C-alpha cells in the first residue's frame, strides 16, 4: 500500500535470499532518512536445484510494486548467477511503476554499464547506505543527483560512473540491519507470503566485518577491495558492541533461533577483538555458532577462546591439495603444512565440526594435481567434512582473464558460460565431466572423509582403474552417509545448545 507519512516509499527487492543482509542495511539507512521501506524477498535459495521465476511470480511482484507507488525501486544484484531472473524482474518493474529503477550489490558494483544498458536508471557501487538516501532525497526534491558519490547513471546515450565515495571506514556508523522488516513479503512457489521470512528462522546470519584480506583469483572480493577509495581499509570490522547488540535484538525478535552463522569472508582475528567478543557473547548470547576462516587465519588460541563460548563449526577453504594450483592458479599462498596445521588446530581446540572446501576437476587441474589433493586429504588429522565442487568462472574475477590468456577458453566461450541461464550455471558447478581416472580420484577423495573406507582406499589408490566397480560402490554408500551425517550434525548442535546453555 502507498505510504501516507514521511517522504514516500522505497521498494527493495532481494533475490534468492530470505535473509539478504544488504537490503536490511539499506532499510535502516532509508528509515533513518524518513522513508517507508517495502522489502520484497524474491525467491528462496537452492544451490542444487534453483528455480527460475514464473509469470505468476512476476505478476505478484508487479501488483505489489504498483500498490506501493514508490519513489524508486531498488534491486540487490549480488551475483551473475541469477541474472536471467533479474532481467525479467527489471522488465516487470518498468511495467508496474513509473518510478526510477536502481541496482546495487557486488555484480552491480563491478558492471554498472551492463545494468544501465539493460534498463536500470541508476546503479550504486560499493556501500549503498549513504548514496541511496542522497539519491532518494534528490528524486523526491527534484534536485540534481549527478554529483552523488558512487552513483552511475545514463545521460542521454552516455554512461556516467562517479567515483566511489562517501563510505564509512567505521562501519558501525551504518547502524544495525533490519532484523524484522516491518513491511515485507516473500514471493516463492507462485505465492506471496506476507511478513518478513526471517522471523521463523532457526539460524541467524550476521557479519562482523566487510571485505576480505586475501587475493583468491576465483573471487570478486579482491577486486571490490581495489575499488575502495584511498584511506578506506580493505577489511572493516564492526565493534564487538555493535555485533552483540544485533544478536541480542535478533534473539528477542526471532524466537526460534538456535544457531548463529557468521557470514564474514574471514572471521575477525584482530588482537583483543576475539577476547572481548568471547566475553560479551558468553554473557548475552548463549548460542552455538559457526565461522568461515582461512588456513592462514586459523590460530589455536583464537579457536580455543571461541570454542569455550559456543563455536561448533569452522568452514575453511582448502580449494586444492596441489600447491601449484593454489599458488599459481588460485593465488592462495598457504603451504601444505599451513593447511595441515590449520586442520590440526581445529581438532586441538575441540571444535565439534570442521568443514573444508575443495574445487576440483577444472581446466587448470592435471591428473597429478588431483592426486595431490587426495594425498593431502589423507594427511588431514581427525574427523572432518569435505565439500567438493567445481570451479565457477564469475564475471569480475581474475581467473577469467587467466583462463583466456592460457588458452582454455575464448572470451566468447567464457561469456556464454558466465551468463548462461541459472540452471546451467549451477549444473556446471556440480557437473563432473572428466576422464574415468579423474572420476575415480575424485570419488576416492570424497570417500576418504569416512574412516570405514580408508583401508580399501589405500588398496584402490595403487591403480584406481582396476577397482572402478568397488570405488563406485563406496562412493554411492558415502553419499548416503553424507545425508545421515547432516542429520547427526544438526542434532548434535541442538543438543549442544540444550546441554551447554540450558543445562
Model-predicted segments: where are they?
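Acidic, low-complexity intrinsically disordered segments
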Residues: 2-244
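Structural recognition of alpha->loop->beta junctions
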Residues: 114-133, 308-313, 376-388
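Radical SAM [4Fe-4S] cluster-binding motif and immediate context
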Residues: 180-353, 360, 375
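Hydrophobic/aromatic residues located in beta-strands of well-ordered beta-sheets
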Residues: 10, 101, 148-149, 260, ...
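Flexible glycine/acidic-rich beta-alpha junction loops that bind and position SAM and/or redox cofactors
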Residues: 46, 112, 156, 214, ...
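Radical SAM enzyme core and accessory elements
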Residues: 1-13, 31-32, 58-66, 194, ...
Amino acid at each position: 500500500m502507498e505510504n501516507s507519512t514521511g517522504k514516500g516509499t522505497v521498494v527493495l527487492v532481494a533475490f534468492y535470499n530470505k535473509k539478504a543482509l544488504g537490503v536490511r542495511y539499506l532499510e535502516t539507512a532509508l528509515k533513518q532518512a524518513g522513508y517507508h521501506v517495502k522489502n520484497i524477498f524474491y525467491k528462496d535459495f537452492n544451490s542444487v536445484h534453483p528455480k527460475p521465476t514464473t509469470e505468476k511470480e512476476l505478476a505478484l511482484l508487479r501488483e505489489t510494486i504498483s500498490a506501493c507507488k514508490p519513489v524508486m525501486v531498488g534491486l540487490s544484484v549480488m551475483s551473475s548467477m541469477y541474472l536471467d531472473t533479474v532481467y525479467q524482474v527489471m522488465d516487470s518493474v518498468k511495467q508496474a511503476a513509473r518510478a526510477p529503477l536502481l541496482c546495487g550489490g557486488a555484480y552491480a558494483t563491478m558492471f554498472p554499464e551492463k545494468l544501465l544498458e539493460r534498463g536500470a536508471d541508476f546503479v550504486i557501487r560499493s556501500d549503498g547506505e549513504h548514496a541511496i538516501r542522497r539519491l532518494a532525497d534528490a528524486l523526491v526534491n527534484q534536485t540534481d543527483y549527478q554529483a552523488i558519490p558512487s552513483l552511475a547513471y545514463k545521460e542521454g546515450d552516455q554512461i556516467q560512473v562517479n567515483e566511489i565515495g562517501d563510505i564509512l571506514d567505521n562501519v558501525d556508523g551504518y547502524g544495525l540491519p533490519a532484523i524484522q522488516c516491518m513491511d515485507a513479503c516473500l514471493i516463492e512457489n507462485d505465492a506471496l507470503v506476507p511478513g518478513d521470512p526471517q522471523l521463523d528462522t532457526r539460524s541467524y546470519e550476521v557479519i562482523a566485518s566487510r571485505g576480505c584480506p586475501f587475493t583468491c583469483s576465483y573471487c570478486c572480493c579482491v577486486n571490490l577491495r581495489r575499488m575502495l577509495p584511498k584511506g578506506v581499509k580493505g577489511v572493516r570490522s564492526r565493534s564487538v558492541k555493535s555485533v552483540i547488540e544485533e544478536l541480542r535484538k535478533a534473539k528477542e525478535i526471532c524466537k526460534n533461533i538456535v544457531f548463529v552463522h557468521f557470514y564474514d569472508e574471514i572471521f575477525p582475528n584482530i588482537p583483543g577483538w576475539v577476547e572481548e567478543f568471547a566475553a560479551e557473547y558468553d554473557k548475552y548470547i548463549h548460542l552455538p555458532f559457526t565461522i568461515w576462516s582461512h588456513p592462514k587465519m586459523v590460530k589455536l588460541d583464537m579457536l580455543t577462546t571461541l570454542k569455550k563460548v559456543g563455536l561448533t563449526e569452522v568452514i575453511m577453504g582448502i580449494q586444492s591439495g596441489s600447491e601449484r594450483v593454489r599458488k599459481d592458479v588460485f593465488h592462495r599462498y598457504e603451504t601444505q603444512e599451513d593447511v595441515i596445521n590449520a586442520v590440526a588446530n581445529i581438532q586441538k581446540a575441540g571444535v565439534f565440526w570442521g568443514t573444508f572446501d575443495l574445487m576440483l576437476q577444472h581446466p587448470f587441474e592435471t591428473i597429478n594435481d588431483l592426486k595431490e589433493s587426495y594425498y593431502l586429504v589423507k594427511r588431514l588429522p581427525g574427523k572432518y567434512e569435505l565439500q567438493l565442487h567445481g570451479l565457477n568462472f564469475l564475471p569480475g574475477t581474475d581467473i577469467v582473464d587467466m583462463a583466456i590468456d592460457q588458452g582454455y577458453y575464448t572470451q566468447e566461450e567464457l561469456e556464454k558460460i558466465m551468463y548462461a541461464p541459472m540452471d546451467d550455471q549451477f549444473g556446471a558447478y556440480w557437473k563432473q565431466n572428466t576422464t574415468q581416472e579423474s572420476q575415480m580420484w575424485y570419488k576416492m577423495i570424497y570417500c576418504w572423509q569416512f574412516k570405514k573406507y580408508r583401508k580399501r582406499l589405500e588398496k584402490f589408490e595403487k591403480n584406481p582403474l582396476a577397482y572402478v566397480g568397488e570405488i563406485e560402490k563406496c562412493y554411492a554408500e558415502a553419499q548416503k552417509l553424507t545425508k545421515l551425517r547432516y542429520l547427526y550434525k544438526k542434532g548434535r548442535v541442538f543438543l549442544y545448545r540444550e546441554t551447554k546453555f540450558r543445562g
